[in-house]
Curated annotation (Swiss-Prot):
Keyword Lipoprotein: no
Main location: cytoplasm
Name of the protein in its database record: Ribosome-recycling factor
Protein source organism: Leuconostoc citreum (strain KM20)
Disordered: annotated segments: 131-154
One GO cellular component term noted in the UniProt record for this chain: cytoplasm
Pfam families for this protein: RRF
Entry-linked InterPro entries: Ribosome_recyc_fac, Ribosome_recyc_fac_dom, RRF_sf
Gene Ontology molecular functions: ribosomal large subunit binding
Residue ranges crossing the lipid bilayer per the database entry: none
Amino acid sequence: MAFDLTDAKSRMQGAQDALQRELTSIRTGRANPHILDRIEVEYYGAMTPLNQVASISVPEARVLLITPFDKTALEEIIRAINMSDLGLNPSSDGNIVRLMIPQMTEEGRKDLAKQVKAEAEKAKVSVRNVRRDAMDSVKKEKEMPEDDVRKAENDIQKLTDNNIKAIDDIASEKEKELLTI
């Protein structure tokens, strides 16, 4: 009887996906609409994601243009951006919000690279926890022959190693992007 790895695979993939989402919100030196993904605007009394109350475009390399679908949301959009931890200063002409992405300093790049490493480490810990859970469930299988247990443990370890390598690749790609001027 072979051990089913689908749950472990999907949970490890979930850790990778969470890392990808987390890294898209880290701003580099270029304008990227995804840095605004976590910003929510109070719109008619409810907290609503910014991309549902406005269109976000990138007209230039370091400029984000936010065009509200409803002009009454303009002030709330500005307030939400100011309250976020992005460190961006929105400017408005009454119809649109313009965000200038400042050139990053060397120190800022290094700090963000450290943040990338920390997020990658969280993802690795998550993958290792999935491995531990899978190993525990293999050991709890009473009717499983010892050879099958050993094979399942090896398969789980290979899956873990592959996911850790993928996480390292994702993190190093983001670090390279950050440290490139």
